[in-house]
Amino acid sequence: MTPRAPAIRLVTFGIGDAWYAAEIAYVERVLRHEGVHPVPNMPPWMEGVLEHQGRIVPVIDLRRRFGLVEDDGRAPTSGGGRLLLLSLGADVVAAAVDRVVDVRAVAEGEIASPPRLVRGVAGEFLKGMVRRDDVMVLVLDIPRLLTPDEHLALDGCVPPPAAAVVAAAGSLDDA
């Protein structure tokens, strides 16, 4: 009996006409795309922040992050949409997508490396590609959605927990 290759569970989602997937290990939850508050002076791909279960979460517009914008620079909208709450190590971000389709298990060997040209254009975000029915799905390398510098920049848009603010205010009184 031949041992089976380990399976990876992927959350499949769409942005425009393209299909993407993220390993389910990084996806905490799928939310409706609502309650996002803009934050001034953020990168164009940073949509804003939302409050979820007592924490402030930065929202990344994946369409803009991947450069999928109209000629006039505006990201096309398809209405509604979903937010994938993603765990990036110590950080949690929400990724705006058009729709979430399903969760599917694929053998690790089914995920093919993208061709060299594709790796050069979008390789920073890609783990590989997998065929789903008759469609090619780009599997994202979720930990690489943000660079270390971008993680630091996002820290500036999310206020510290209230306890840290109170502690800091108390230390100012001591000065």
Where are these regions (language model features)?
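An acidic, low-aromatic, low-complexity terminal/linker signal
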Residues: 1-175
